[in-house]
């Protein structure tokens, strides 16, 4: 424990230095500032060119959204800048993001930020860990807790198991895990507290996916460098503009790729209109095939395994525990989660509304905002119905978490999602800390960056909903 304390203490200032409103050393030296000046302005993302998002001042984003709380700290953070490329979604996101962290609720404010630290640390997401460390201290949290889980109260430490499962293998959550947290005792959780904690955990796990998926960089350095400005909000008629949606891949070849995708989408939509029925057995067979093929969708073997940082390990129990494919060769797979047996609309939403009424409606609005978001454009084309493509992405994310929709033809996934996109989706959803710039660049090379951010919004929400469904189903079974 002494080693863990010393390692965490040494790293703590470094992370707080990059957090909004953070504390730490006086800032980098003159040599570092000169080097940064030579490089020019740094954007909010390592993947997206700075000129793609820095269009207008931060005030334009706040004015467009009408969110005073966003600017309460006097700055717009990098995550908001990138996500703000889609301000209609960001409005719903911010309401839910703000609610469990800052409004009245069963958990103390400092506890909420500590739970967020625990969640983000599972994916080694230093961006979120640093941000919530600063917020933890600003809300009166005990600095000793930041030396590691062993310094936190036993009640918080009891969340480690369900945090681990929600982050990596939510299908393993059972009513016994819920019972262990709620059973009468000295460090017991109330049901209201647990629901808020589960929303926080799943929110921060999925937000870690967005941070890694979009290459979000730390905020302005501690020497007072200004925070990035916000992007221009898109019009309702078109997707947020890029200088050249084909600039990464060579115009004619990319145009052919887009046209081929458009043709596949058109054929699928026509077959749906003709109601060309597929038997239930065939639908189930196609799901099992897609689930099995997902075993082969993995990052390149030359991707180095990220080395866990000591400051992250302070907040993580069983760090070797990670995502494993829902269906593994030679292993007994858990039963498939049939979405019709426990849906968000009919079961999860009503349970959340009953136990956490402030959050249920906002969660539902956020899921719908991401799923239905469209500008009716693809790359250089406008007037496009993208519903089948968005549905394929959403359902593929749920597929890798073992969730099947009986009324969905999983053959559409293979028709619409190229392999590079599948690799990216699975990496960002399941082990986001392995995401690389190359993965980001390889998929949809002919699409706008804002469209790639849109994919990450679908990833964020589909992943969060999948984990919540497993947790809420376990609570329902515990209560019945």
Swiss-Prot record:
It catalyses: a hydroperoxide + L-cysteinyl-[protein] = S-hydroxy-L-cysteinyl-[protein] + an alcohol. Phosphorylated by ULK1 at multiple sites. GO terms for molecular function: L-leucine binding; peroxidase activity; protein sequestering activity; protein-containing complex binding. Residues 66-239 are annotated as: N-terminal domain. It is found in: Cytoplasm. The active site is at residue 125. Keywords: Acetylation, Cytoplasm, Isopeptide bond, Oxidoreductase, Phosphoprotein, Ubl conjugation. It is an enzyme of class 1 (oxidoreductase). There is a cross-link at residue 175 (Glycyl lysine isopeptide (Lys-Gly) (interchain with G-Cter in ubiquitin)). InterPro entries: AhpD-like, Sestrin. The N-terminal domain has an alkylhydroperoxide reductase activity. Belongs to the sestrin family. Functions as an intracellular leucine sensor that negatively regulates the mTORC1 signaling pathway through the GATOR complex. In absence of leucine, binds the GATOR subcomplex GATOR2 and prevents mTORC1 signaling. Binding of leucine to SESN2 disrupts its interaction with GATOR2 thereby activating the TORC1 signaling pathway. This stress-inducible metabolic regulator also plays a role in protection against oxidative and genotoxic stresses. May negatively regulate protein translation in response to endoplasmic reticulum stress, via mTORC1. This is Sestrin-2.
């Amino acid at each position: 424990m002494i080693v863990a304390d010393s390692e965490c203490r040494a790293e703590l200032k470094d992370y707080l230095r990059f957090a909004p409103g953070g504390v730490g050393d006086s800032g980098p030296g003159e040599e570092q500032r000169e080097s940064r000046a030579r490089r020019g302005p740094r954007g909010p993302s390592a993947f997206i060119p700075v000129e793609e998002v820095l269009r207008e001042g931060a005030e334009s984003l706040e004015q467009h959204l009408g969110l005073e709380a966003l600017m309460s700290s006097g700055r717009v953070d990098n995550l908001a800048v990138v996500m703000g490329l889609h301000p209609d979604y960001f409005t719903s996101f911010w309401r839910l993001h703000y609610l469990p962290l800052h409004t009245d609720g069963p958990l103390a404010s400092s506890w909420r930020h500590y739970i967020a630290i625990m969640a983000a640390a599972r994916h080694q997401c230093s961006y979120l860990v640093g941000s919530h460390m600063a917020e933890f201290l600003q809300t009166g949290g005990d600095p000793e807790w930041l030396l590691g889980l062993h310094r936190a109260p036993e009640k918080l430490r009891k969340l480690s198991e369900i945090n681990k499962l929600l982050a990596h293998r939510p299908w393993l959550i059972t009513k016994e895990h819920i019972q262990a947290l709620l059973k009468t005792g000295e460090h017991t959780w109330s049901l209201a507290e647990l629901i808020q904690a589960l929303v926080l955990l799943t929110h921060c796990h999925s937000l870690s996916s967005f941070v890694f998926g979009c290459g979000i960089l730390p905020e302005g350095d501690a020497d007072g460098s200004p925070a990035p400005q916000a992007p221009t909000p898109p019009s309702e008629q078109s997707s947020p503009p890029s200088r050249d949606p084909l600039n990464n891949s060579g115009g004619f070849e990319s145009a052919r790729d887009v046209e081929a995708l458009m043709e596949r989408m058109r054929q699928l939509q026509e077959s749906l209109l003709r109601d060309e029925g597929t038997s239930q057995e065939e639908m189930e067979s196609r799901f099992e095939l897609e689930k099995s093929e997902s075993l082969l969708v993995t990052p390149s073997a030359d991707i180095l395994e990220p080395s866990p940082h000591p400051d992250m390990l302070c907040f993580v129990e069983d760090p070797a525990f990670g995502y494993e494919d829902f269906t593994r060769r030679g292993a007994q797979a858990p039963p498939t989660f049939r979405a019709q047996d426990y849906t968000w609309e009919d079961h999860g939403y009503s349970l959340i509304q009953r136990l956490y009424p402030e959050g249920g409606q906002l969660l539902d609005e956020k899921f719908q905002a991401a799923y239905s978001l469209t500008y009716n454009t693809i790359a250089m084309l406008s007037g496009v119905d993208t519903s089948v493509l968005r549905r394929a992405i959403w359902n593929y994310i749920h597929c890798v978490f073992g969730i099947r929709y009986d009324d969905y033809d999983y053959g559409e996934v293979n028709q619409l999602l190229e392999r590079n996109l599948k690799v990216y989706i699975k990496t960002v959803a399941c082990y986001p800390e392995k995401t690389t710039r190359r993965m980001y660049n390889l998929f949809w090379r002919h699409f706008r960056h804002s469209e790639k951010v849109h994919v990450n919004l679908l990833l964020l929400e589909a992943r969060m909903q999948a984990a919540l469904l497993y947790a809420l189903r376990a609570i329902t079974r515990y209560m019945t």
